[in-house]
Amino acid sequence: MRTTISQLKEMKQNKQKIAILTAYDYPTAQILDKAGIPAILVGDSLGMVVLGYDSTVSVTMEDMLHHLKAVVRGSQKALIIADMPFMTYHLSPEQALLNAGRFIQEGGAQAVKLEGGVNVADKVKRIVDCGIPVMGHIGLTPQSVNQLSGFKVQGKTLATALSLIEDAKALEKAGAFAIVLETMPAELAAIITAGISIPTIGIGAGEECDGQVQVISDMLGMFTDFVPKHTKRYADLNGSITKAVSEYAAEVTKGAFPTLKESFTLDKKVLEELKKCVL
């Protein structure tokens, strides 16, 4: 049985931290289930860490549905949350509802995530009113990276901090079940967390959030060119995979792989008969 929205809210009430990770494929989803991760985010971050885009802006509904379906097939226990891509909910509450519905009906997600605060509250309410759980996302919102002039810490001034607090309260009022707080001062995240009844999930927002989410490629060390400040590397998969692939290539080149152990053989009698037929 999958984690429920109510269970996540109970975790906040009981001061039990919520660990969330992204996943984009079947085997990763299986591993996260096995490790006991209660919720999986199929993030539009896949645009950058899987598809090689410069930002998340280029990600489409089709991209998301393709990866979402794979994650759903691989997971049996985690709550699956799907990111709504850029321009799939911005035009109207009806557009937002239709696309959110696709993630639930076609993709098999249990919830969707939208970026924005006051400006998307009407979309959140419309989706929630139709029975689809919504996670909010404020602070650094990657889909607005061009407007924000890059991936920068948000809420560092009094005005912007107050604006983010207003965003959080608007999302709670609209019916969001949780809110991602991304790349903001830890003190501000703590104030927001204490001021709302729904769970806050931090990414670069300090330790006082009700839970944390990380991009799995970052925390597993898949890339060497960039490591976000908010990420702790729990493995060096880039190094491990590079070493393994190099060893494989070297063994193939010198004829050390495959050996008899990795090969299949014919019955001796069949082999003898075969040789008579072809030699």
Curated annotation (Swiss-Prot):
The keyword Magnesium applies. Binds 1 Mg(2+) ion per subunit. Keywords: Cytoplasm, Magnesium, Metal-binding, Pantothenate biosynthesis, Transferase. The active site is at residue 182. It is an enzyme of class 2 (transferase). GO terms for molecular function: 3-methyl-2-oxobutanoate hydroxymethyltransferase activity; magnesium ion binding. This is 3-methyl-2-oxobutanoate hydroxymethyltransferase. It comes from Dehalococcoides mccartyi (strain CBDB1).
